[in-house]
Every structure is written in structure tokens, then in C-alpha cells.
Amino acid sequence: MAPERRERMDDACLKALRRIEARVARLEQAVLGGGDLLRAALNERGLKVYRCNPTDRLLLPEGAPDEAQERLYALLNRYSFRLYLRDAIRLGLFRPEELTRFCSRAAALRYGRFLESIGAATPEGDALRLTRPVSSLGPTLEWYVARLFERELLAPAIYGVKFRGLEAGGDFDVIAWLAGELAYAEVKSSPPKGIEVAEVSAFLRRREHLCPALSFFIVDTELRMKDKIVPLFEAAAPHQPVVRLHAELFRAGIATYIVNSRRGIAANIRRCLLEWRRRR
């Protein structure tokens, strides 16, 4: 290749890189600015956060580097990996090649090596043991969904949120500043059969205290919502009709969305958000 042509290509690549860097900077600024709006929205409601973004119950070891966090977030996008983690947590000590209920043996081995590489699991004989004695995937799933709001929807988010003096009690799993409004998401790592009407009622009470513009009840499953979750909402709030939006996505009342994981959590939230915007 002629030197002149190579130089032109280098200049073009450099300009493209600068455009990408500028775009990333604009996106980062948008997210950071949105964080101020999120805090302002909570302050307007008289809500004082005394805990958020806890790390003590995450799969990641304390002080995990950013690279490990990014790699975990990327792999959590795979539903099969999330199911694999549930089995690993249930067992505590496990042989990666045996966790093949939801993935191939090759994938199970890759997942095991990955957990070891980020410090989330340590070898013990011919098996692995999770580094932290977590009892549920729930907190890590909340962490993941908060990041998903930020990365995929450019919505600043906090997770595992507790407020002082709030009668509703319990954690608010994820709170985000989404599309210029306050949004609240409950995140369930249990399959539908493990969810009861009391949990739906508690979610609805927290929603009433927070007064978000829209809220999501996210169940990390590809199973049907109509069979178990929809009847729970109908029992907990009979005055709020539940309507099907598409496949297994539903709206309860004005702006509460029932979401599962089929076709991806981010894609399903986008579909709900579009429906919400069209009705405004």
C-alpha cells in the first residue's frame, strides 16, 4: 500500500475514533446529568436514601476491578448463564461440567472458567465453590438490571434502595430516571411458581409511596406470565385491569408493566416504554 494512501486511512481512522470518543463523552454526560435529576425527583418526594447500591451480597468479590464487572455484566445478558448461576448458588460447591440443565457441557465449562477468572469462584478439589456465600441471585440480578437501564436505555439507576421512615418497608430493587421520568422496577429471580400475592401487594405499596411515572415487575423467566403472575396482580389489585400488550408482556392499571425475559429484558422494557409514550 502506498504511504500516501496509508496516511489517509490513518487520518480517517483517527477522525472516526475522535467522533466515537465525543459521542461516548456526550452519553456519559447525559447519564451523569440524569443522576442529578434522579436525586432531585426523590428529594421532591421527601424521600431520603440511607442505603443504595450495596455490594455485600453480589457474586463479585468486594473490590472487583471494573474489567471483571464489565465481563460479568456482558455474560449476564445470557439467560442460560443466569440459570447456571442459580444452580451454582443452590449447590455452593459444584462441578461446572455437571450444571447442564440449561446449557451444553461446553458452555457449562466455559461459565465455570469465567467465574474463576473474575474471582467469583475458587477451586476446591475437582470442583468450584463460590467465593462469597450468597443465598440468592437476586441482589446480583438487581445490580445487572440497574446497569442495563444505564447502558441500554441511558437511564441513570440505583439498586437495593432503602429510604428512612418509609411505611412500605423493604428494598426498592431498582429506581431509574427513564425518559425524563422516575421509574421503579421490582426484579424477581425466582420462577413464577415461587412468587406469591403478598410480594405483588408489597410491590404495589412501594409503588404508591414512590409515585413513579411508570413501574416494572420483572420476572427473570421465559415462562408464561398469564398463568401465575397475571392472576396475582388481579388478586392484589382487582380495580386495576390487566391487559396484554404483546406475547407475555402485560400492563396492570395505567403504567405498571409485567415483564419476563423472553427476547431480552431490555427489549421488553423498550416495548413497554413505547406503549407508555403512545398513551401519554
Language-model features, listed with the residues they occupy:
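Intrinsically disordered, low-complexity Ser/Thr/Pro/Gly-rich regulatory segments
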Residues: 2-280
